[in-house]
Amino acid sequence: MSLELALDVQYATTSDWLPTEEQLMLWAKTAIGNGMDRAELTIRIVDSRESQMLNSTYRGKDKPTNVLSFPFEAPAEIELPLLGDLVICAAVVENEAREQNKTLEAHWAHMVVHGCLHLLGYDHIEDEEAEEMESLETQLIESLGFTNPYKEQ
């Protein structure tokens, strides 16, 4: 059974290169894939200012970050296919890609996969959880034709 994904993409910034809605759809479907048969997801691509404001408000960190995940948490008695929202900062992704010698496309794919896994409940706070999440991310990213995102370039 293939995933039916309703994706809302919001481009709230500009850049020399941003992923297309088709690329975002492919990467999100790959990450969510077998976890659900229907899902709704919003991906908002923002500038550093908006990322910093959200990161400060929700995580207490007064700086922009690559990706923020906001899972939708419905009351237990309500079953909705709403997965949640991802907010991705284009400038941070660009800087990280450059620093890590990765292509923009590869790093964007990694950030979408990483964020979707957070929405599915994965985390990387504890070492054991981090290993599980990174292993799954690596499998998913490699299935998309990119190299291991955690391998030093």
Swiss-Prot record:
One of its GO terms (biological process) is rRNA processing. Keywords: Cytoplasm, Endonuclease, Hydrolase, Metal-binding, Nuclease, Ribosome biogenesis, rRNA processing, Zinc. GO terms for molecular function: metalloendopeptidase activity; RNA endonuclease activity; zinc ion binding. It is an enzyme of class 3 (hydrolase). It comes from the Bacteria. One of its GO terms (cellular component) is cytoplasm. InterPro entries: MetalPrtase_cat_dom_sf_prd, YbeY, YbeY_CS. Zn(2+) binds at H114, H118, H124. Its EC number is 3.1.-.-. Its cofactor is Zn(2+). Binds 1 zinc ion. It is found in: Cytoplasm. The keyword Kinase does not apply. Belongs to the endoribonuclease YbeY family. Single strand-specific metallo-endoribonuclease involved in late-stage 70S ribosome quality control and in maturation of the 3' terminus of the 16S rRNA. PANTHER family: ENDORIBONUCLEASE YBEY, CHLOROPLASTIC. This is Endoribonuclease YbeY. It comes from Shewanella sp. (strain W3-18-1). The lineage of its organism: Bacteria, Pseudomonadati, Pseudomonadota, Gammaproteobacteria, Alteromonadales.
